[in-house]
């Protein structure tokens, strides 16, 4: 026991022996500077305790070991009621936020879907005026595509709830009254699901690489059909799939459980896309993506096609990722923080000028976010709300 305490003490203050990283996001805790005042008023002591909780040596080792014991021996879910992960049938894991949206089915406020669709329509028109292709890609929710793997109480919705029209359905209906190039990947996944190939991994919350590749192919088709995108290169077709061990986002929910070994679903092979030979093209494409975490796998899918160019991804309009596609690999620079909201930074960002493609990507559960306000801000910046000569100079 003394050896264990010594290791914990050394790990806390010296960083040796090294700890293991934990999955998930935690709020950073800092300790105030020790002064007579902070000592006497208790501020220092109050801050040290949460700091020790986060920085205790071998904390990660202890948490993973406790979670492994509780899961393996006692069949208890790690994290208890506070966890964001839900255990489903046959080793499938789900993120609670997506299950909650499925069971509550929140809708837009009156006329909200129509207003968002109108903003997207105006944004597409403005993009076309500048020779830029535009499309909206609505990513599906795993809980909506594979409800049969949810825990039994959540598999079938009560008739009254199932009859409700949620925000995603409202927006799709509103967009059908416009000319907006919209790829409804929810509907596409339900169609492709009948082919018998998994489109989501059991251990992850995002679409797998095979599903993302097919979604990209559908979105690229919608982009190339636009008059401003005739020169876009043809991407290699998805010829099939092969099974491989899950990697990266295939197991992002497994990583959140903080176990030493993956759950059974996290060890199951997942489909990976097989592409036809890439058509020869010297075109270098500049793509701007705005959206949520489903776009990361789309960028991976783009890199597999052999396309050359650059991708600027504005993640939730708060962080800017710049990716260079060389035709054989992708090179990603360190992300740039855009602030708490970042609308002004994104709207006036020089990387938007001269892009060939603007792609808005969001999961269906974020439909009511209205693109995090960016479509409306881009339209306002380019339509004379304020000084169009300044605000619209770098905006579509």
Region spans (language model):
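Extracellular glycan-modifying ectodomains
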Residues: 1-396
